[in-house]
């Protein structure tokens, strides 16, 4: 659910080179062409267009080896995984979900050069699980495209996500005529029940993670925390809520993510410093200056 922070670099965006590691598919688009590519992505992010992207399994909007990072969750590699998370996570209005489905957007900030665009987009979500509450969600993005107009890298931040979670809890508290604490407890129960139902349906045989539904529910409600706004990629219930949506697409891959171990995604394997300094991207986001000291570039 989790989605895009774009803090613009203070360097001048000159049409020179993309510093750091080179890429044979590096393109040189006009600003208008990059705007069109940006709009194409967001058009397909909305429901129900995102359903068609999910059904494609490997969205043609991504390169095969696309790299993606979302601040509140983790990094995502490859077109299939990114198709499941970027489009599949928000594609079912009838399934319990924190923010529901995206129904409209407005790009409020945009700057672009060569094959990179940095933008801020306010996406309106219909939180169908919270009485069709309409929520404006601010998503900051850096996106890089290859010569074929496919996304090869993206870096995303959900701005004010903690405020968003508090707003959802307040809405739930109002609906149950209770306190914020009671609403948080109710949300925990709802999410745990949904995760366990999904586990029982899809995580069978070698993919089974819990002995039974009771063991699943007890673990999710007592052994791990619900999670804070930055913990949708840590050992929390909120992280498992994110991955629960993906289980139906690939049980073998995603069942461990909702299980007790958390798989490779819902685990506390990073300190704050390690999160910030993680070397990940293959191509530098710095454009037009001979700077080779980008600490985010992978080895």
UniProtKB/Swiss-Prot annotation:
- What EC number(s) is this enzyme filed under? 2.3.1.-
Domain of life (superkingdom): Eukaryota
Query: Where does the record say carbohydrate is attached?
Result: 28, 58, 77, 126, 177, 212, 282
Query: Hey, which pathway is this one from?
Result: Secondary metabolite biosynthesis; terpenoid biosynthesis
Question: Would you indicate the residue range of the signal peptide?
Answer: 1-20
Q: Give the Gene Ontology MF terms in alphabetical order.
A: acyltransferase activity
**BP GO annotations:** terpenoid biosynthetic process
Q: What keywords were assigned to this record?
A: Acyltransferase, Glycoprotein, Signal, Transferase
Q: What does this protein do?
A: Acetyltransferase; part of the gene cluster that mediates the biosynthesis of an ophiobolin family sesterterpenoid.
Family note: Belongs to the bfoA family.
User: Protein name, please?
Assistant: Ophiobolin family sesterterpenoid biosynthesis cluster acetyltransferase
Organism field: Aspergillus terreus
